[in-house]
């Protein structure tokens, strides 16, 4: 009987982030937004009606409008979006730290796709792939759709790798400690203590929460646990929670970040903003918060505005992910 050699017996870790256009031109942005906004997990609407609205109204307007915003934040030195740049570096650093695992990354929307990276990992000999969605707080619009895509890809494979998943880490001790330390380090750099630290999370239609999405609860717990870590050391700082990036006419989770910042201007408060729901800086942090919200805050008479960068590809982020993975699956040393 003919013998076949089998060299495949490796483990891999696949970091997954949201996604990005390939470039900041209208065509690239339109292609990315179409894939993103066509996901029924993201937009829960009548599919026929939504397809008409998306293709005839939203895509032509938003793609053109977003050229300037993407161009503003684009990493022109590497010709990549910040999200792609930081996620790629993060995976590379984690790969160097984990000798017994292949570490790679994918984007849920855009490139590199989950499908292409699962194929690549299999070609490298991976028979077990650990999926790590880089969303601390679970939502059907983020974490769930990652697994939807993973299993869609698996359904087409003759030889399916074993799949394991890392749990949402919104209340993980390593995550809470890392975010808390990040805030402390930022506060030390300031000339004066701010009146408020605002935790700004990406918003979600309230209807999704009413249907059972736990996202709000996860955001609130992250906020509460970090607040408990810091409030004794900073008794004169108010810690508050808000939600940004509202899209469409429906009611979203409140309070809205824009509204909270307007309140702070009227109260003559200085504010430090952190966006702990984002693993890497992106359009929502670098343009929406750092530029648009800050300009509006200052224009309306706000006192001082400071934004804490996301964890990005920092060593603290690498160590945090390493510890979370080790806690979940007991890494081979």
Swiss-Prot record:
Binding site for Fe cation: 202, 284
Main location group: cytoplasm
Keywords: Cytoplasm, Heme biosynthesis, Iron, Lyase, Metal-binding, Porphyrin biosynthesis
InterPro entries: Ferrochelatase (IPR001015), Ferrochelatase_AS (IPR019772), Ferrochelatase_C (IPR033644), Ferrochelatase_N (IPR033659)
Any one cellular-component term (Gene Ontology): cytoplasm
PANTHER family tied to this protein: FERROCHELATASE, FERROCHELATASE, MITOCHONDRIAL
Protein name: Ferrochelatase
Organism: Francisella tularensis subsp. tularensis (strain SCHU S4 / Schu 4)
Gene of this entry: hemH
């Amino acid at each position: 009987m003919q013998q076949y050699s089998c060299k495949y017996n490796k483990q891999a870790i696949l970091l997954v982030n949201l996604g990005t256009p390939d470039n900041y031109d209208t065509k690239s942005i339109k292609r990315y937004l179409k894939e993103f906004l066509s996901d029924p997990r993201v937009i829960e609407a009548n599919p026929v009606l939504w397809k008409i609205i998306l293709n005839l109204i939203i895509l032509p307007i938003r793609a053109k409008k977003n050229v300037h915003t993407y161009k503003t934040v684009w990493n022109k030195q590497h010709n990549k979006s910040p999200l792609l740049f930081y996620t790629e570096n993060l995976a590379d650093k984690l790969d160097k730290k984990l000798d017994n695992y292949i570490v790679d990354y994918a984007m849920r929307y855009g490139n590199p796709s989950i499908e292409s990276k699962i194929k690549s990992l299999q070609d490298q000999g991976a028979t077990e792939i650990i999926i790590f969605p880089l969303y601390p707080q679970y939502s059907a619009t983020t974490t769930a759709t990652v697994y939807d895509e993973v299993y869609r890809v698996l359904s087409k494979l003759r030889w399916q790798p074993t799949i394991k998943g890392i749990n949402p880490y919104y209340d993980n001790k390593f995550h809470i400690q890392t975010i808390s330390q990040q805030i402390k380090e930022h506060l030390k750099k300031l000339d004066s203590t701010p009146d408020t630290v605002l935790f700004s999370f990406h918003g979600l239609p309230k209807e999704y929460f009413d249907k059972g999405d736990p996202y709000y609860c996860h955001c609130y717990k992250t906020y509460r646990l970090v607040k408990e870590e810091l409030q004794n050391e900073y008794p004169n700082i108010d810690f508050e929670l808000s939600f940004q990036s509202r899209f469409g006419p429906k009611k979203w989770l409140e309070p809205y970040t824009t509204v909270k910042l307007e309140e702070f201007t009227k109260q003559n408060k200085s504010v430090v903003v952190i966006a702990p729901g984002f693993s890497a800086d992106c359009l929502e942090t670098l343009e929406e918060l750092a530029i648009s919200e800050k300009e509006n805050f200052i224009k309306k008479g706000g006192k001082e505005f400071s934004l804490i960068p996301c964890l990005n590809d920092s060593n603290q982020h690498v160590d945090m992910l390493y510890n979370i993975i080790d806690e979940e699956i007991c890494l081979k040393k």
